[in-house]
A protein has these predicted regions:
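Radical SAM enzyme [4Fe-4S]-AdoMet core and its adjacent flexible, acidic
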Residues: 3-110, 128-132
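Short, acidic, Ser/Thr-enriched surface-loop or helix-capping motifs
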Residues: 114
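Flexible mid-to-C-terminal extensions adjoining Fe-S/redox cofactors in radical SAM and related proteins
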Residues: 126-240
Length: 240
């Protein structure tokens, strides 16, 4: 972090059923601790866990996301913007169509490496023998599992067919789907509802920035994190 000049990292937290008023934590990170690049993730837990989010929590969460979006616009107008990871949205130079379909690429484009050299699709699968891909010495030996993760894309999930946000989440997180449905190709519906709300807020902020010159002037701009092909995201086809 020091080598990057104190940039390029996120202060990340997790909210549960016990703290659905998560903006309090985010504003504490920003106002009291001085962090400007923030993220707050909803917990994914067994339905019988006391920490698990419930359907009754959703209206409160939606209010929190709207509160956060409006407060971010206020801060931006004051020249003191903060970044919320899930509101980063570039409508002109977004991910290429390949990334919009395939998502994070867990198990195929990247893997988690444990301290003892084992390979897993991502950190959320570490320790589960059924999801061990191989090791750093022998490489990927469980090719059947790797091929199964290749199918983790937006078109492999029938429930995604009519969702307006499907090309922004690419079908969602395989680990979350497994924990919620028992299948990496399943659909974590609760997570879908939360994701769509975040997208609505991100789009609202984009509209506000275009309508208000002050907001546009102080907008935070992001560079693409993909250097594979150089194509413009929304229309380009990845050549990797």
């Amino acid at each position: 972090v020091a080598a990057r000049g104190g940039t390029g990292y996120y202060m990340r937290g997790t909210f549960t059923h016990h703290n659905v008023d998560f903006t309090k934590d985010l504003f504490h990170m920003a106002d009291d601790l001085g962090f400007t690049e923030l993220s707050m993730e909803p917990v994914v837990a067994s339905p019988d866990s006391p920490e698990a989010l419930t359907e009754d929590d959703l209206p409160k969460l939606f209010d929190q996301y709207e509160l956060l979006a409006n407060d971010m616009l206020r801060r931006q107008k004051a020249g003191k913007p903060i970044t919320f990871y899930h509101y980063i949205l570039d409508l002109k130079h977004g991910p290429c169509i390949y990334k919009r379909i395939s998502g994070c690429g867990s198990g195929t484009e990247y893997m988690a490496v444990t301290p003892w050299g084992d390979l897993y699709p991502c950190h959320q699968f570490v320790g589960d023998p059924a999801y061990k891909l191989g090791n750093v010495w022998d490489g990927v030996t469980n090719t059947a599992l790797r091929d199964e993760f290749k199918l983790c894309n937006v078109y492999a999930r029938p429930d995604c067919k009519d969702c307006w946000a499907r090309l922004y989440c690419a079908g969602g997180c395989a680990a979350n789907a497994l924990h919620a449905t028992g299948d990496i190709h399943g659909t974590y519906e609760y997570g879908c509802k939360v994701f769509r709300k975040r997208m609505e807020c991100a789009l609202m902020m984009q509209v506000a920035q275009r309508l208000d010159p002050e907001l546009s002037q102080n907008a935070v701009h992001f560079e693409s994190d993909c250097d594979g092909c150089g194509e413009d995201g929304n229309v380009g086809v990845c050549k990797n």
